[in-house]
A protein has these predicted regions:
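Acidic, Ser/Pro/Thr-rich low-complexity regulatory regions
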Residues: 1-113
Length: 113
C-alpha cells in the first residue's frame, strides 16, 4: 500500500475522532439504560456501582486505548466501518482503498458487541 498523504491522514484522523465519539456514545447509552433499571428498582445501587466501575475499567478504557493511544487512523476507521459507526461512503475516495484493505485483512468476521 502507498504511504498516506498528510491530507489523507488528516481526513482519517477526523473520521477516527467522529468514530470514537459515536462508539463511546453507543456504550454510554447502554450504561444510561442501566441507570434506568436502577431508578425503576430492577437493580440496586450496589449493582449499578459495579456496572459503572466495570464500564470505566473495561469498555471506556479499551476505547480510549484504541482511539487515543494509537495513531493508526485508517485502522480506527476500518473498525468503525465494520461496526457501523462510520459509513464507507463517508470516507474520501482517496482513502477508501486503504481502509478496504484493512477491512478485508483484519475485520473479516468481527461482530459488533
Amino acid at each position: 500500500m502507498k504511504k498516506l498523504s498528510k491530507k489523507q491522514i488528516k481526513h482519517l484522523r477526523q473520521l477516527s475522532e467522529i468514530a470514537y465519539e459515536k462508539e463511546l456514545s453507543f456504550y454510554l447509552d447502554n450504561l444510561r439504560n442501566r441507570f434506568d433499571e436502577w431508578k425503576s428498582g430492577n437493580i440496586d445501587v450496589w449493582a449499578l456501582s459495579d456496572i459503572i466501575h466495570e464500564f470505566h475499567d473495561g469498555k471506556s478504557r479499551d476505547l480510549y486505548k484504541f482511539y487515543v493511544s494509537g495513531d493508526d487512523y485508517a485502522l480506527h476507521v476500518a473498525h468503525a466501518v465494520k461496526n457501523n459507526f462510520v459509513m464507507f461512503d463517508e470516507i474520501e475516495e482517496s482513502c477508501r482503498e486503504h481502509v478496504q484493505h484493512l477491512l478485508n485483512n483484519f475485520f473479516l468476521d468481527t461482530p459488533k458487541e
